[in-house]
Amino acid sequence: MKSPHSPSFRFSIMVLALSSGFAHADNVRPEATAELKEVVVTGTAVPTRVTRNQLDRETSTDLKQVMKDQIGMDVGGGNGVAQFYSIRSVGEDKINLEVDGTSQSTKIFHHQSRFQLDPALVKSINVEKGTGAASAGLGAVGGTIRVTTVDAKDLLTDGKPFGFKLGAGLSSNKGSTGNAAVYGYQNGFDALFAGNFLNNRDYKDGNGNVNRGSRLKQHSYLAKLGYDFNDDHGIRLTYRQEYQKGNRTDKAEFQNVDSYVGVDGTYQKEQSYNLEYRGRNVGFLDKIDANVFQINTDDTKPPKGAPSPKAHASGTAQGGVPIGQLELSKIKATGANLNLASSFGDGHMVKYGVNYRHETSEPSDKGAWLKILGLYDRDKEKKAEYGVYAEGIWNLHPVTLTTGLRYDHFKYNAASKQSASHGQLNPSIGAIWDINDNFSLLANLNQASRAPRLNEALLANERAGAAADLDGNLKAETARRAELGFKWRNDNFNVSGSVFHQRIKDLIVYRWAKINNNTASITERGKIYNGGTLKTYGYELDASYRWGGLTARAGVSYVKPRLNGEMYYGESPIQAEDHESSFTFWNTGRQWLTGLSYQFENPKLEIGWRGRYAQSVKYTDVARGQGTIHGKKAGYGVHDIYANWQPLKKDNLNVNFAVNNIGNKQYRSHSQRFPDGNGRVPFYERGREFALGVNYRF
């Protein structure tokens, strides 16, 4: 068996990495370490990743639950798009969600997430933390959640040409789920059709309070058709749909409280179409990965000014808008990627390619509002961006050096009919030094830029869009991350860690226009410009020990973000350097993870315990009716127990059980809005819940 530390194995990992990162096979059993498919490629020493095998052994139904024992990424909030994502505290405006090479950067509304992802359809999730290297793709300033969906070959068992998968789950906190898939692969043809259905009613938090507005009906579909011409060439056509429907207000992140209540029928639907080609060993090219895609997002919600109970009785919302009249906003992203790799000499490789994306938004119709404000001359928002890159991996045993250069360019056409364009070069460099078979060091310095996003689709026809002027000298945001890390492995003991510093300059500010509601006039136009800097620094440490069937783990992460410059939240300037929001960052502070599990061989049963802890941290925010709040997020400690039983002693049948939040703790995640406002109350996390799930492939 080839040693995992031999030069050829180390290079095979780097062929996959192709970036200024750290590559290793983490926490796999000794007999599996030589399998290339087990290798995890990550941009930092402490990995954040999840595989299909892990998901099948859990009761998780959303990405928040999937990521709760991962270091460096947080998800907080209610259900569905009420959840906010962050990577090392950096918010969604600076991070990417890439699914099978498809992505978009436009958001509907700052009171909801722009990400939708059902883990039931996923093969693997790898989180690239912080500023990416040259090959990381468009806009990789804060990190990328890189997702691969399942293929037929991932699910087939015992050499069969076709198969089925069935699954179901129940939660004591008013939730149920069911899923089914049929798939096959024969004579080069493969097909997969999968669906997942989730029904969550309003859940209770740790104090027994019902968090109204957390109710969610969700379905997701995945369809794939493909053909492998031979072992080196294949094409795939994929359709993916994510659909969420609930009883929400116009601001999904808040509960339905007092007179601020939701409306049935609000929904978000995302549909993506993706055509992929995979080629290997084509002349001087070792690898060709290419795709073209389109993503369409529809969002309906109540008009601004949520209906009150009295308005429900009369059939109209505040402002005289009928209850049944929901506003529809649309986003479309179309793009293509071409990624190539060539090897030469004594274990050297160059990766190079092109990324392209075009985005448009169609705001909800606010004709009456626009007429009042005199905003007649307006356009749809649109943006085009492309990037070209080259990246080299140089085998200088015992050092592997990576160097990269990327050029990105954008052109942005705003609703105000004004435009801006800008191009920028971004270098990256990194090194891995294998001091010996057990100890490695890494260092990297990455730079990346991110084009401005389109205005929020819901607001592009008013104060945040048509009434805002675009700075003709607008530039892309530029991020630079420096990181030092290590990994040490000795028999069954593993320790990895890193320290990092990241700076994002020329932050793009979307300052809204000021409107006098009494006179229905614009008193000051808004502006889109470069206005600030976001600095984050911190560290991560992860340690694990395995002895027979026993595995113990402990980890810690710490991030301190600071915001400076002429920054605005809406029409108001920020009040402090720790003023958080979904636009920039969440103060996640210092967080700890602990775990202990034991794997029995007969019966094939794993039982475990997980502890999650967050220390209190200061923050600044604005709450409705409360003004500026300089507060402290309460710390918390939450414990879960879980079990996975495989009755057939194989991974095709899993029976899963969990008790989450055993102590019934009432708490809020640090990766979401924290303070209560008048009628604007953010969601708490779920209280104690018992969860049971089963999945079977045959």
What are these regions (language model features)?
Residues 33-66, 84, 92:
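N-terminal periplasmic "start-of-domain" segments of outer-membrane beta-barrel proteins
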Residues 152-154, 161, 176, 180-268, ...:
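Periplasmic-side early beta-strands and strand-to-turn transitions of outer-membrane beta-barrels
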Residues 212, 232-288, 296-331, 373, ...:
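Flexible loop and strand-edge segments within Gram-negative outer membrane beta-barrel domains
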Residues 327-329, 333-340, 381-389, 474-475, ...:
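Outer membrane beta-barrel strand-and-loop segments of large Gram-negative receptors
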Residues 243-245, 251-256, 367, 411-413, ...:
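Surface-exposed extracellular loop regions of Gram-negative outer-membrane beta-barrel proteins
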Residues 64-103:
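Extracytoplasmic beta-strand/coil segments of soluble accessory domains associated
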Residues 117-165:
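A beta-strand signature from Gram-negative outer-membrane beta-barrel systems
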Residues 395-401, 500-504, 523-622, 663, ...:
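Gram-negative outer-membrane beta-barrel transporters
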